[in-house]
Swiss-Prot record:
Belongs to the ATPase alpha/beta chains family. GO terms for cellular component: contractile vacuolar membrane; endocytic vesicle; endosome membrane; pathogen-containing vacuole; phagocytic vesicle; proton-transporting V-type ATPase, V1 domain. Its main location: membrane. Vacuolar ATPase is responsible for acidifying a variety of intracellular compartments in eukaryotic cells. The B subunit is non-catalytic but combines with other subunits to form the catalytic complex. V-ATPase is responsible for energizing electrophoretic K(+)/2H(+) antiport by generating a transmembrane voltage of more than 200 mV. Induction: Down-regulated when cells are exposed to an acid environment. Up-regulated when cells are exposed to high pH. CDD domains: ATP-synt_V_A-type_beta_C, ATP-synt_V_A-type_beta_N, V_A-ATPase_B. PROSITE patterns: ATPASE_ALPHA_BETA. Pfam families: ATP-synt_ab, ATP-synt_ab_N, ATP-synt_VA_C. The keyword Transport applies. It comes from Dictyostelium discoideum. This is V-type proton ATPase subunit B. The gene is vatB.
Amino acid sequence: MVGFEDHIAAITRNYQVNPRLDYRTVTAVNGPLVILDNIRGPKFSEIVTLTLGDGTQRKGQVLEIQGKRAVVQVFEGTIGIDAKHTRCEFSGDILKMPVSEDSLGRIFNGSGKPVDKGPNVLAEEYLDIQGQPINPSVRVYPQEMIQTGISAIDTMNSIARGQKIPIFSAAGLPHNEIAAQICRQAGLVKKSGKGVIDDHEDNFAIVFAAMGVNMETASFFKRDFEESGSMDRTALFLNLADHPTIERIITPRLALTTAEYLAYQCEKHVLVLLTDMSSYADALREVSAAREEVPGRRGYPGYMYTDLSTIYERAGRIQGRNGSITQIPILTMPNDDITHPIPDLTGYITEGQIFIDRQINNRQIYPPINVLPSLSRLMKSAIGDDMTRGDHSEVSNQMYANYAIGKDVQAMKAVVGEEALSSEDKLYLEFLERFESSFVGQNHYENRDIFNSLDLGWSLLRTFPSNLLKRITEKTIKQYYSRSSKGTVDSTN
């Protein structure tokens, strides 16, 4: 008998049984939140499976713990949950995302489940959607340019690999079309047939997350990616407007977890686009209101700055890893108000902004990017001889200066009339018109590489005599001013 007991102990000593407890203690449902009572040992961020009376299962996450009381946010919404028939099972684990290189070319909903009629992704790893904290000392400064094929971005507001730079838009502006165009055309700069870094053509991937978009917009993105052939290198996460609002809180984190795996394990250069961050912030406000927290500015929670930083700061590069994450969040400013808390806090965290202008859009110019309030703080590390071309910085500075002067002359013309303008003033007006129509404006499917964009910039700067180009050195003027421009207004690639 003793030997039998020893045998049983030997074959079971390596097994630990943690029975999952099933509760029927729902005490209240408040918006997207479910309050449970008499819970034994709940854990913060623990995943909870709620089984409704009809057998339907929904996932939730522990948001707050007060003794034996737990507040759970339900990702699929709380409609149909009642106190009598709902069973809640605590998993003892946090929310993890199954990740694999096979995620590319797939379409997921806002909860990370495939919706493209394909099989579930065969997971190579399960990663915490909150990401791993990155030691600041091992971060690598962003360098080398991400080429979007859009002249106003590539030439005037160059994006460095590993940068986070938002697009500030507003309702009714073509930010969705711009996002789709960036996905179609984005890549690293190719120079004279040789890449800046090895194998970057094959190692470039895109993770696209849409939050709170309508069915028409979701269909547009899916159709555009499939028709352009960029779907094979894209992982698409779609949270529709009729999906539960609470789901929008985890959608960007699922997308970024996938991006981190592709960047740091598969060593790909990943471009992450998140639209619309305003929908995300509204979902955050809804949860905060349901928890009866003290509201901050315009009803948004006081911790929104910290929460947004947990998303934006997941971009970057790490020592010892060849991959990188470049992030372009897109947000719509309510009432075109750049002082609204969402763009205001986003601007503090990110490294610049690209500004979509309604007045330029009203003049039928696409993409309606206003370069004056736009800024890329890391542009200096993304351009130059080794990465784009030696004249890039000077051309950008000179076009900025001439465009700003042209705007001043345009305002003066409205007051004093064209007759009072000097011949030099008229040159700036001519440059202003050509800059907006020919340089900023381009076709939806026109992919200009950085070298064509710089040549096009020179063709505009030749409007002026060389002595007026005061932000360009004599050496650069001798090299580029007299030669014919390769970039043309009607060129399409």
